Structures are given as C-alpha cells and as structure tokens.
C-alpha cells in the first residue's frame, strides 16, 4: 500500500487497413495503412490529495497508395508522446492540470513533383492551353517532374488547466484553458494528384503555387518552413446532473494559428483518362479535369455553443433535446470551407420489460457561410425510428428489431462532405433483423 504506483494499464493494437476507391466500377487507387499502437498508463497513489499519473503513447504508421490515381507517396510516421494529468479538490472546486510532449517524425521516399497542366476555372482549355510541344517546353514545365526524399521532425507540446465548481447541490460551473500544437499529417504535406474520394486534385503544403511575373501557373517546392498548428482554447460550461431533469450548456472559443485545410486555387488540372467505358475510338482516350485544392496553413478562429437537455419523464419514457452551432472564419477574412451547419435534434425513448423503441428527429439548418468556390446547402429534417422486442432463448439474450431511416424520404446533402452534390444521404429505408449476444 505504500508503493507509489497505484496501477499500470497497457494496451497494444495492430491494424492492417486496406480500401480501394472505385470509379465507375474500376479500382482507381488502393490504400494500405499498417499501424502499430501502444499505450502505457501509470496511475500513482494519492499524495497531498492529488490524483493522476503518467502515460506513454507510441504509434507507427506505414502508408502506401497504389494505382493510377495514387495522390500521396508511400510514407512512414512515427510518434511517441509523454503525458501527465493531475487533479485535486479544494473544497467545492476541482482543479485539473495536464501536459503533453510529443515527437513526430515523417519520412517519405519517392515524393513526386509531377509536370501538370493548369488552367483557370474561369476559362476553358481552348482559351488557356498551357501545354507546349515536348520540343519547345515552356519555362513553367521545364524540369517539373522530380523525385526526392522527405524527412520532417516535429516536437508538439500541449498544456491545459481547468476548474470545476460545485456551487450548489447537483450543479457545477466549469472553465478550461488549453494551449496545444499539432504536427501536420503526411497527406497534408505530401499529397499531389487526383483524389477520387474528394473530387479534387490535391496538392500538399510542401508545394507552393507560382503565378507571378506573367508566368504560367505552376507548382514548385515551397520556400517557407513547414509549421505546426498552434491553438489556444477556452471552454465554459454549466451543468445540472442531479434528478430526473438535467442539462449541459457549453460555449467555446478557439484561435488556431497555421490551421491546415484545403484551399481552392481557382485552377483545374488534368486528372487522367476517362474510365466511364464510353467508346472514344481505338486511338482516342478522353481526359478530364479536377479543381485544384492546395493544403494551406492559415490563422483561423472557431467559436460556438452546445446545449443538451434531458428529462426522465417516467420510469419508461425519456426525452432528450440537443443542439450545436459553430462559426469558423479566417483571420484574414472569409469563411472556412465545409463548416457544419447548426443542428437541433430531439430523441424520444421508451424502455419496457420486453419492448423498447426510439424516435429521432434532427433538423439541420441551411448553411450559407461558405468559402470561395463553395456552394450553400439547404436545410433538412431527418426522422429515424426503431422498435425492439427482447426475449431469451436459453441463456442467450435476443432481440427482434425493425429499423426505419429517413422516414419522410427527405433529399439531404451533407455540407461537410467533399462530394455532397454527388452523394446525398440515402432515401427512406427499412431493416428487419435479429441480434443477440452469445
């Protein structure tokens, strides 16, 4: 009992994930991500009324993309982090402290800077044909195809502090402050090619667009240092957690310097050949273009509000309503793309001896705060429901269920999706099944 270490927890996970992106039934690119992750937590005995401990987190990820439309090179990411958390009560006030230091290393071989033809989205190819004959290459295309190795090391750190005040029975107020850094991912740095999953020609932050002095627009290696995201955040909360009626209200404000996101360039690039299967003749292949989006590190602000109210009406019936809204803006002016719209949801639950049921009604507001080259998204209402009948079969618990989604057959687009215009949410659907635990 006098030992300093109270408990040790360890977790190890190995994942070998693979998926393929299809274009009209043809595999365009196969992604393979093999990762090993380990975490060890050491909790100490209480000393001077402090509770907490240390944790060590290690992760290794090997990523490859193979195919005609592989937009990122093979890369290896290694990270190891040491974190510390502590908390202590001072009367009705709980003080929480935390810190984290990390080392992240990104290595990639065969990073490509290919020669591509860029055209303005405001004009067609005939008006702006930047492709010259091979015997008379333009300055913008000379030497554009290059291969090189990349190695970057980042040392992000994080600090946090919070107070929770139980100012009366069943209620508390909370405030938390945090300062954190994040290393960019391999895809945010190294991407260069067509990405079917987003419908963009993606270019990583390691490359910069050059279009000054009357030159033909082209990409080259950036002259700027690769930076980490730096965020400063404040959260305020009010909770009621005792009794049949409760609520949580939370407001937050976050300033992020060098926030990585995909920014529209106003240009398009040749993305390869058409795989639609149309007959273009024996010696003719039709190419297509995609809008070019480049990862950019910009200073942004995010602020918003979240609320949740829950009421246990009777022993069998419960009701919950919650909503959230967020604004995300560039400090230089303008909106961040693909910001979620305001949302309001209501949930009704019934739990009987044998029968349980749920009804979900969600209202997504119209999103009109859009970035350049981004369209607004109409609001919509989604209604889902399910009914379950529970029974026993021997020693096993089983349930027959009927599930219905999008009961009103609403046409709905997800504003946060890169492909919202091509892949709306599914229409009305029903599922009947049985589930159990053995």
Summary of predicted features, one role per range:
Residues 1, 38-44, 82-88, 161-165, ...:
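Residues on the lipid-exposed face of transmembrane beta-strands in outer-membrane beta-barrel proteins
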Residues 1-166, 174-178, 240, 245-252, ...:
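Face-selective signature of the C-terminal outer-membrane beta-barrel domain
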Residues 8-21, 166, 172-174, 178, ...:
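Membrane-embedded beta-barrel scaffold of Gram-negative outer-membrane proteins
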Residues 14-18, 58-64, 90-92, 101-107, ...:
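Transmembrane beta-strands of outer-membrane beta-barrel pores
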Residues 86, 164, 172-178, 319-325, ...:
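Conserved C-terminal beta-signal and adjacent last beta-strands/turns
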Residues 106-151, 191-222, 263-294:
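Solvent-exposed loop segments that connect transmembrane elements
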Residues 252-256, 260, 264-370, 389, ...:
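Gram-negative outer-membrane beta-barrel transporters
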